[in-house]
Amino acid sequence: MILGLGLDVVEVARIQRILAGPPARAERFLARVFAPSERAYCDARQDRATRYAARFAAKEAAVKALGTPEGVRWLDLVVERGSGAPSLALDGLAADAARRLGVARVHLTLTHDAGVAVAAVILEGTGP
């Protein structure tokens, strides 16, 4: 059963402006929003702003799918990239919210084109 659905669109230029801005501001943003593994993945790519935008969209979509629980931190949501499709790991208050909803599986899809990054998150489970 589908327990939650979240969708988000991020303009890549918005992230590019942050990355190209004052280094201290960019670092604060990256440290507050992205886990070290996400940063390593994005920073190793030529299109790093696009990669960051997709991950930011994934986090926003996940929060929407969870019902916008209070206190969830960006770092409670981590986009992981193995050899296949990306996945979303939940920790902290995000994991607590998922447990309360009865989430058994999190589906994530990312795409980017024409200057935007899009993410969709579907939460699947049996319910509370």
Curated annotation (Swiss-Prot):
Any GO BP: fatty acid biosynthetic process
Matching InterPro entries: 4-PPantetheinyl_Trfase_dom, 4-PPantetheinyl_Trfase_dom_sf, ACPS, Ppantetheine-prot_Trfase_dom
Protein name (Swiss-Prot/TrEMBL): Holo-[acyl-carrier-protein] synthase
Similarity comment: family membership: Belongs to the P-Pant transferase superfamily. AcpS family.
Location in or out of the cell: Cytoplasm
Domain of life: Bacteria
Any Pfam family matching the protein: ACPS
GO molecular-function terms, A-Z: holo-[acyl-carrier-protein] synthase activity; magnesium ion binding
Residues involved in Mg(2+) binding: 8, 60
EC number: 2.7.8.7
The entry's keywords: Cytoplasm, Fatty acid biosynthesis, Fatty acid metabolism, Lipid biosynthesis, Lipid metabolism, Magnesium, Metal-binding, Transferase
Cofactors that this protein relies on: Mg(2+)
Gene3D superfamilies the UniProt entry points to: 4'-phosphopantetheinyl transferase domain
Any single GO CC term annotated in Swiss-Prot or TrEMBL for this entry: cytoplasm
Reaction(s) the record says it catalyses: apo-[ACP] + CoA = holo-[ACP] + adenosine 3',5'-bisphosphate + H(+)
Function: Transfers the 4'-phosphopantetheine moiety from coenzyme A to a Ser of acyl-carrier-protein.
Organism of origin: Anaeromyxobacter sp. (strain K)
